[in-house]
């Protein structure tokens, strides 16, 4: 009798697809390129009106349990929203607050900490950030200079995504005589905290330099467990950001295809030229591979499966490469016009570059991936 292996379905449900359609319609109206450019060219660090609208839609509480004011849908629904937010280039602190700060509280927070912050997050009344980096080098337990002692934390964190607009920060710091890493909650509106905006390639995602000088801090999670918690947190965020990147890459491909079909040269659509065809085909293949890896990551995240570390790293690497390729080739297909400020091509190029760095570069995640694969094979 022939062996019939069990089928695995990574597709989203009908309700989740309806959520995608609802989100796409809402963001098409509320996060147009005109709105994105308003943040890019203006002084506001994010679109506060859009942020309030997302709160009213219930998106901010998608993965937050009902007892803490959330909708308690789950991470698959959050992945659906992330893809649409990436497609629309939504200029909000969603990633820092939902993928990082809220997830940190859900993973390690006490009931009191969750009750203090999660309802505010779900309502859109609080913004969070994750303060891990201490400069351009890769943060490790051995090179942490930020220190925590006696309920106080001191050090410099830079760059911190949405650190200039956050109400609280989840800070990675060395603690105790042994200097083991721990996570700490810091009210960044309190004393001992100085924040300075940091310019990046994509001003629609604000960053800051945060100086902590004996700032009040409370432990998040068990003492000395900060590094394993940070790794878990980054894995979860990597899957969600991968969906943003896939959404952005698809938007860049759609933009390139539409232009190629509407632009004529020598009496023909430029989409009929082999060089353009191959660029579009390569973009499509890269995006579909990245999407498949992101779907696998979504499954692992929703189940908190043992495969999550490998699935997250795979999704991260594929999405970084696909989005950068799509954003770059979109500019090339547009020709000289693609390099101008007036065309929207550079908006995706900026976002592709930034999302490719904000959780650590694709190169770092490749190193993580091979390390994890080798550990699994041992």
Give the positions of each predicted feature.
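Short beta-strand-to-turn element immediately C-terminal to the catalytic PLP-Schiff-base lysine
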Residues: 106-109, 171-174, 185-188, 211-214, ...
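Alpha-helical interface subdomain recognition
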Residues: 2-89, 108-113, 120, 124-125, ...
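N-terminal glycine-rich flavin-associated loop
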Residues: 90-112
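A short core secondary-structure module
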Residues: 131, 156-193
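A short, Trp-centered hydrophobic/proline-enriched beta-strand micro-motif
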Residues: 124-134
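A generic local secondary-structure boundary/capping motif
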Residues: 117-119, 135-136, 145-146, 157-161, ...
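Cytochrome P450 C-terminal beta-domain/meander region
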Residues: 140-154, 305
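Flexible, small-/acidic-enriched active-site or ligand-binding loops
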Residues: 139, 143-145, 159-160, 188-222
């Amino acid at each position: 009798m022939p062996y019939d292996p069990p089928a695995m379905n990574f597709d989203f449900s009908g309700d989740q697809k309806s959520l995608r359609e609802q989100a796409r319609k809402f963001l098409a109206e509320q996060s147009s390129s005109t709105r994105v450019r308003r943040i890019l060219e203006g002084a506001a660090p994010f679109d506060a009106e859009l942020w309030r609208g997302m709160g009213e839609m219930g998106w901010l509480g998608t993965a937050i349990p009902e007892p803490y004011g959330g909708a308690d849908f789950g991470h698959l629904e959050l992945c659906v929203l992330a893809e649409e937010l990436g497609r629309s280039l939504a200029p909000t602190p969603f990633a820092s607050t939902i993928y990082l700060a809220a997830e940190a509280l859900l993973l390690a927070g006490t009931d009191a900490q969750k009750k203090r912050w999660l309802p505010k997050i779900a309502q859109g009344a609080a913004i969070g950030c994750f303060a891990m980096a201490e400069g351009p080098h890769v943060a490790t337990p051995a090179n942490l200079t930020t220190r925590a002692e006696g309920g106080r934390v001191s050090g410099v964190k830079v760059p911190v995504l949405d650190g200039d607009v956050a109400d609280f920060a989840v800070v990675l710091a060395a603690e105790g005589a042994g200097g083991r890493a721990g996570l700490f909650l810091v009210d960044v509106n309190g004393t001992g905290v100085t924040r300075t905006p940091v310019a990046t390639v994509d001003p629609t995602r604000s960053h800051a330099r945060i100086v902590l000088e004996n700032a009040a801090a409370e432990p998040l999670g068990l003492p000395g467990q900060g590094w394993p918690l940070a790794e878990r947190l980054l894995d979860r965020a990597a899957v969600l950001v991968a969906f943003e990147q896939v959404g952005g890459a698809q938007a860049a491909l759609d933009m390139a295809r539409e232009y190629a079909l509407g632009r004529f040269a020598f009496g023909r659509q430029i989409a009929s030229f082999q060089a353009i065809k191959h660029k579009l085909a390569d973009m499509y293949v890269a995006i579909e591979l990245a999407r498949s890896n992101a779907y696998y990551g979504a499954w692992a995240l929703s189940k908190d499966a043992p495969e999550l570390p490998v699935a997250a790293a795979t999704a991260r690497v594929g999405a970084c490469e696909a989005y950068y390729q799509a954003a770059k080739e979109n500019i090339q297909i547009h020709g000289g016009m693609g390099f101008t400020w007036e065309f929207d091509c550079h908006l995706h190029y900026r976002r592709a570059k930034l999302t490719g760095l904000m959780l650590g570069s694709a190169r770092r995640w490749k190193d993580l991936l091979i390390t994890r694969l080798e550990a699994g094979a041992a």
